[in-house]
């Protein structure tokens, strides 16, 4: 039935007068906001009254203020305040970062030591800490460094001469600052998505590289606002060191107004200088936050002097054959570096439990080199856990996994298996690439930086060589024009294609796909599946967890059906999809086909 027949009395052939009206000639009257206007007038009146009262009252002593604002004693005190602030901010931030990393360490004793330090230093008032440090010479006459349990002394110096008032002030401010800054950094670290750590680990990046290249740059977006609050508070806290008779800005002002009795003008001298310091710090905070917001916004505002510094950037090396990509997907078969024999994966009776829930139960699988295996099954059947176990992101409770006869997570010496340390496991992971369900691209790095990070840091490739190969991979996934884009500026399908290119950059023997299309809109699924189809012809061993049954039929050599942590049935696509033997397999396929 035609849609127009459902609306009685409306003739679709007629055109109403309203539809013919040309609104472009109408004058637009902006919305009125009387409350906003009243608020603006009130704010202007308050500002005018305050300024008038301040600058017309002679008791403020602006003449005395002008006389002392640039006076030499004040500037010397200001310099000491700035020096203390800078030294304590830098050293406190470094020590605080180390304490934060210790707090999230897997060593219980190290984490407890860090917690105890933070608890103690946050509990002690600043003025008490400064006085204790200033009187440390009473407790320890000398500071000695020597060889433990021997009489050999390497360093010996009187405490009172070593711990001057300036040194005591610097040490006290640093210790106090580090305790508070440690919790700020820890909060920033915890704010970074766990998937970022898993992605970095799957690429084989070292723990140090994960921390300083992946986690901390992202954590800075959370750290900076509260961190700069602490630095601003530190600048003002330097006034507390007056208890050590150290002539910083506030102490110097106190000495002057006690002599000339001009209290208010001299206090205003200190106040305005503190305002100047805070203003400079606030401006610095603004630009530093903008720098670390890379990738967080789709259209970032260019930083000052960006054009100047870009002149010193090295141009990217061209690809070997000078090809350019027009956005069309090219065949991976033409990429020489990707035509390699995949690794054979053998899964020997692995089991895994999370508390009382057994997610994998005595799994046995043999995946030949160069094969394409699709794992299907209902949600919660253990499919993703199995993938994570293959590259040791999830440690199994029992059983073993090998790639080309080499055990994952262990090294064999005779008839003894030794569990590998984390750094050795990271090296093994370079042969097992993984593409995550939620992409897990590093948002603060460009597309190019995402791809070349692991080849340079893990494989030891020359940067130019890594860039050439990255550009080749991007051409193959149809994204050469996105080389300088950030992940947030890409669609979901584009992000997943970049994730595939990133995993391929390590030239792995085995490539794992964890539901690569589940986070995509239906319109974007096809472009990712096309890439995987081309990969299936390169010889790399592919293991794909998917709900795309039609895709599994087309690309897979074998299909594995899982439920409740068990492999219910495995076989060729024809056997599983057309002639499944197990009733549970048939029931599942009846719902999804």
Language model: regions and residue ranges:
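Transmembrane alpha-helices and adjacent helix-loop boundaries
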Residues: 2-318, 579
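Catalytic Walker B motif of ABC-type/P-loop ATPase nucleotide-binding domains
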Residues: 511-514
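H-loop/switch region of ABC-family ATPase nucleotide-binding domains
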Residues: 546-547
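A short, surface-exposed alpha-helical micro-motif characterized by mixed small hydrophobic
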Residues: 552-554
């Amino acid at each position: 039935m035609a849609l127009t027949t459902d609306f009685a009395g409306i003739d679709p052939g007629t055109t109403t007068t309203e539809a013919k009206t040309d609104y472009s000639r109408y004058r637009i009257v902006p919305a009125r906001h009387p409350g906003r206007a009243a608020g603006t007038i009130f704010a202007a009146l308050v500002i005018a009254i305050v300024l008038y009262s301040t600058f017309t009252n002679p008791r403020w002593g602006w003449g005395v203020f002008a006389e002392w604002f640039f006076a030499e004693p004040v500037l010397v005190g200001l310099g000491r305040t700035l020096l203390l602030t800078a030294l304590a901010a830098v050293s406190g931030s470094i020590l605080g970062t180390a304490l934060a990393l210790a707090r999230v360490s897997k060593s219980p004793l190290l984490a407890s030591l860090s917690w105890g330090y933070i608890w103690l230093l946050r509990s002690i008032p600043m003025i008490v800490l400064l006085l204790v440090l200033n009187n440390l010479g009473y407790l320890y006459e000398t500071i000695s460094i020597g060889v433990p349990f021997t009489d050999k002394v390497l360093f010996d110096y009187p405490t009172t001469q070593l711990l001057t008032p300036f040194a005591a002030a610097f040490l006290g401010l640093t210790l106090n600052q580090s305790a508070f800054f440690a919790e700020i950094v820890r909060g920033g670290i915890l704010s970074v998505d766990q998937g970022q750590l898993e992605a970095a680990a799957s690429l084989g990046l070292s723990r140090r590289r994960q921390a300083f290249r992946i986690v901390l740059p992202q954590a800075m977006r959370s750290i900076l606002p509260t961190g700069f609050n602490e630095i601003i508070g530190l600048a003002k806290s330097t006034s507390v060191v007056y208890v050590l008779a150290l002539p910083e800005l506030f102490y110097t002002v106190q000495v002057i107004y006690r002599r000339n009795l001009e209290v208010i003008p001299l206090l205003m001298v200190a106040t305005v200088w503190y305002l100047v310091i805070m203003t400079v710090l606030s401006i610095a905070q603004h630009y530093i936050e903008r720098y670390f917001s890379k990738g967080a916004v789709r259209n970032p505002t260019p930083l000052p002097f960006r054009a100047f510094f870009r002149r010193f950037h090295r141009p990217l090396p061209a690809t070997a054959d000078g090809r350019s990509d027009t956005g069309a997907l090219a065949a991976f078969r033409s990429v020489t570096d990707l035509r390699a024999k995949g690794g054979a994966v053998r899964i020997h009776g692995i089991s895994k439990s999370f508390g009382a829930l057994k997610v994998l139960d005595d799994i046995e699988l043999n995946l030949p080199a160069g094969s394409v295996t699709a794992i299907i099954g209902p949600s919660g059947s253990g499919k993703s856990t199995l993938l994570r176990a293959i590259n040791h992101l999830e440690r199994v409770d029992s059983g073993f996994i090998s790639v080309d006869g080499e055990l994952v997570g262990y090294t064999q010496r005779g008839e003894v298996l030794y569990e590998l340390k984390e750094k050795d496991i990271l090296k093994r992971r370079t042969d097992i690439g993984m593409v995550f369900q939620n992409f897990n691209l590093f948002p603060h790095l460009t597309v190019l930086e995402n791809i070349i990070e692991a080849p340079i840091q893990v494989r030891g490739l020359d940067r130019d060589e890594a860039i050439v190969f990255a550009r080749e991979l991007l051409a193959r996934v149809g994204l050469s024009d996105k080389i300088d884009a950030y992940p947030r500026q890409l669609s979901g399908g584009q992000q997943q294609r970049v994730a595939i290119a990133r995993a391929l950059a390590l030239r792995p023997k085995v490539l794992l796909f964890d539901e690569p299309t589940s986070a995509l809109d239906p319109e974007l699924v096809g472009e990712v599946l096309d890439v995987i189809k081309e990969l299936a012809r390169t010889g790399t061993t592919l293991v794909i967890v998917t709900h795309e049954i039609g895709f599994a039929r087309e690309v897979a050599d074998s299909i594995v059906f899982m439920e409740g942590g068990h492999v219910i049935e495995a076989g060729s696509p024809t056997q599983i999809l057309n002639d499944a033997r197990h009733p549970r397999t048939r029931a599942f396929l009846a719902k999804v086909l």
